[in-house]
């Protein structure tokens, strides 16, 4: 039961980050490496604010805003300064490494015995007895569902449709008299806001911040997105965002099983990268066959 709960907790936390990467990778077709910096940005801010006694719920809003600002800067570097998309993300990711260190004051910042989303008077009063072990899962589930439904709602608005259009065909958006650059910046801001929010929740769940915790975030998020969309492509009754959330949980379940079978945790990043490459290659082969047919 402990293993299942752990998989669900971390799977749903990463699902929020995967929703952000779904925007950049699937909708905008933008290889945004900023997420490797915005995830620990949320964790660093969260840890510092928690230590200062800030309400844990408020940390969610602050970290989302901080991540959105980082994403906006990436967009500005790309759109206004005409830097290539991949390089824009790399520049911002590199800058955020130092920013995160400055915010936290050191490379590792524990927040044990602090009031967090998962350890406060309200949680202790509501989740009593046998229900206490499910408190983390329920709290994370609520936050994940709220973010999923908010993203679904946004994508159904005019701004959301324009975001999709920019990813599909920039020329059409330009012909409508809409600034495609601003639309890209908005998409990158939302995506990195979600990634930062995910880092905030992760830090409070793990009770610490580490400057290297964002390493490989992009690959994990992409793997979650591709696994979810590939596995559930025939489930037409599900929204894509639901598939992404499920994909993140499946990914974490695979990681947990690998560790359970004796795989060293130090090898997981390599295995993730190899699996991700295989998924990408298979996906490209499938698309080529469809075009030939």
Please give the residue ranges for each predicted region.
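Single transmembrane alpha-helix segments in multi-pass membrane proteins
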Residues: 3-55, 60, 77-81, 226, ...
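Helix-loop-helix "hairpin" substructures at the membrane interface of multi-pass membrane proteins
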Residues: 70, 133-210
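Alpha-helical transmembrane segments within multi-pass membrane transporters and channels
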Residues: 54-94, 145, 247, 251
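Transmembrane helix-bundle core of multi-pass membrane transporters
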Residues: 85, 89-92, 96-156, 186, ...
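Loop-to-transmembrane alpha-helix initiation sites
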Residues: 10, 86-87, 136-140, 184, ...
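Transmembrane alpha-helical segments in multi-pass inner-membrane proteins
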Residues: 192-270
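Cytosolic-side transmembrane-helix boundaries in multi-pass membrane proteins
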Residues: 168-182, 235, 239-242, 254-293
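Short loop segments and helix-boundary regions at transmembrane helix junctions
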Residues: 26-31, 72-116, 122, 207-211, ...
């Amino acid at each position: 039961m402990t293993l299942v709960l752990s998989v669900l907790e971390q799977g749903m936390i990463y699902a929020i980050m995967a929703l952000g990467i779904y925007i950049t990778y699937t909708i905008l077709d933008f290889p945004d490496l900023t997420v490797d910096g915005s995830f620990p940005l949320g964790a660093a801010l969260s840890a510092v604010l928690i230590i200062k006694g800030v309400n844990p719920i408020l940390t969610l809003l602050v970290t989302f805003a901080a991540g959105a600002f980082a994403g906006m800067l990436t967009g500005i570097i790309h759109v206004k300064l005409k830097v290539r998309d991949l390089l824009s993300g790399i520049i911002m990711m590199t800058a955020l490494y130092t920013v995160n260190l400055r915010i936290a004051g050191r490379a590792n910042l524990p927040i044990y015995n602090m009031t967090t989303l998962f350890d406060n008077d309200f949680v202790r009063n509501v989740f009593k007895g046998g229900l206490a072990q499910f408190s983390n899962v329920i709290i994370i589930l609520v936050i994940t569902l709220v973010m999923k439904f908010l993203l679904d709602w946004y994508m159904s608005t005019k701004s959301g449709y324009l975001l999709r259009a920019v990813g599909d065909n920039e020329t059409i958006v330009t012909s409508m008299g809409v600034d495609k650059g601003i639309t890209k910046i908005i998409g990158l801001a939302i995506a990195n806001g979600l990634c930062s929010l995910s880092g905030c929740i992760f830090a409070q769940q793990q009770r610490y911040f580490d400057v290297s915790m964002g390493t490989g975030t992009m690959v994990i998020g992409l793997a979650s997105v591709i696994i979810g969309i590939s596995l559930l492509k025939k489930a037409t009754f599900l929204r894509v965002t639901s598939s992404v959330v499920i994909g993140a949980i499946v990914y974490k379940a695979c990681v947990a099983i690998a560790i359970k079978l004796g795989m060293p945790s130090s090898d997981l990043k390599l295995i993730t990268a190899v699996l991700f490459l295989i998924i990408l290659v298979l996906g490209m082969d499938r698309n080529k066959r469809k075009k030939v047919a």
